[in-house]
Amino acid sequence: MKLEEKLEHNESLVGKSRPCLHDTHQANGKPIANGNPTANGKVEVYEKQEANGKGNRLGKCLNLYTWQEIQRHSQEADQWLVIDRKVYNVTDWAGKHPGGRRVLNHYAGQDATDAFRAMHLDLGMVKLYLKPLLIGELSPEEPSQEKNKNAQLVEDFRELRKTLEAMNMFSANLRFFFLHLAQILILEISAWLILHHFGSSWLVTILISFLLTVSQAQCSFLQHDLGHLSMFKKSKWNHLMHKFVMCHLKGLSADWWNYRHFQHHVKPNIYPKDPDIDVGPLFLVGDTQPIKYGKKKIKYIDYEKQHLYFYMVALPFLMPVYFNLQSMQVMYLRKYWMDIAWVSSFYIRYFITFGPFYGIFGTVLLIYLVKFIESPWIAYVTQMSHIPMKMSSEENHDWLSTQVVATCNIEQSFFNDWFTGHLNFQIEHHLFPTMPRHNYHKVAPLVKSLCAKHGLQYINKPILKAFGDIVRSLKKSASLWMNAYYE
């Protein structure tokens, strides 16, 4: 059969109901030998279904699809994705996805296997939600991932994950996290005791503002852990504690944070899927966005000086203005009543504890003074690992490559671990979001070795250089904009 005729023949079979095959494949994606061949050489695929706790196999024929067919379904109104060679139509269900609809849309038409494994705890339970969405599987002759991806790299990364699971690297040390929570609560209680004992003088106000700032920053890191389900074995306990830490202790919406942050994790530094780099028109970042703005002669502000705006705007106002207002807006527009109740308890707590000393207006000022001081801390920690790294439009690389090219690490020290909430191990965190952070340093050598094997640059830099690279990156982007704007 000629190549053209073979392609035409395969295309005519795409999406059609195929004879069925037992729901098992070899590592290379080929069907195992216990399938029953039919007249046309195809075999039947049966989906396992449990009935009354017994392993009964109910015959359910699945369609077979090529990657070419799957990639056509990549729009918000028509979303298919692949997990472990199974094809799912998530179009109508995306709005019900606990992690947000956009995360699914970002993988429409793609293999989402590694992202699925990375972002969930109990895969068996989660797959129950996927069962009604199953429409077929990859044709036996199709590779398990898109043809542009390095199959050996994908296999090596999955073997690494299995190794880490066997080493119990995904098991949390609860003592570590509860000591961290104790640190936060002790700082807050200390601030109130000092205020109660010494009064609300300027010196005392400065001191307690410092204590509350440290508490809030460390609270940011703890809520980040809980949002990623890395503390408890059960998702529900992580979610409940996340409400307490993020909403009650910080006064921000947990759901808002998760829906935003998960997008960043699955597609870091990818336009327009990563909300963390959607900072235009105030800032232009990366190499492509500045040139795009420049060629279109767009000049909302003086971009030549955007590195100065970073100091004047991004550092002090990220937490008290941008995050705070966006959190409130999303909570009320999407009617997150649970989060609204929890966040209300944050303000009630502050008015009860600090209101008698400062009054209502003074307490509000204290809240936002603390957020204002905390903001540069969080801005530096969150931006130093991403802003200087590669930014691009969707290229659909494998999970390891996607994360490594968009992130970098900061040298380890006791201070760096504490100051960054262990986000100095940003590469390991992005590869394994549900891994407890106290294990990052243990897996880093294995990740570095895998990167070296496949020619991926594993960047690890001093913290002060990382701070400086943010500004240098903004200057570089400004220069690209200038060249395109004035050419």
Curated annotation (Swiss-Prot):
GO terms (BP aspect): unsaturated fatty acid biosynthetic process
Gene3D superfamilies referenced in this protein's UniProt entry, alphabetically: Cytochrome b5-like heme/steroid binding domain
Lumenal-facing ranges: 197-201, 329-349
GO cellular component terms, A-Z: endoplasmic reticulum membrane
Cytochrome b5 heme-binding domain location: 62-139
SMART domains tied to this protein: Cyt-b5
Motif (Histidine box-2): 261-265
Positions occupied by motif Histidine box-1: 224-228
Family indicated by similarity: Belongs to the fatty acid desaturase type 1 family.
PANTHER family cross-referenced by the UniProt entry: FATTY ACID DESATURASE 2, FATTY ACID DESATURASE 2-LIKE PROTEIN FADS2B-RELATED
Domain notes: The histidine box domains may contain the active site and/or be involved in metal ion binding.
Protein name as catalogued: Fatty acid desaturase 2-like protein FADS2B
The organism of origin for this protein: Mus musculus
Gene: Fads2b
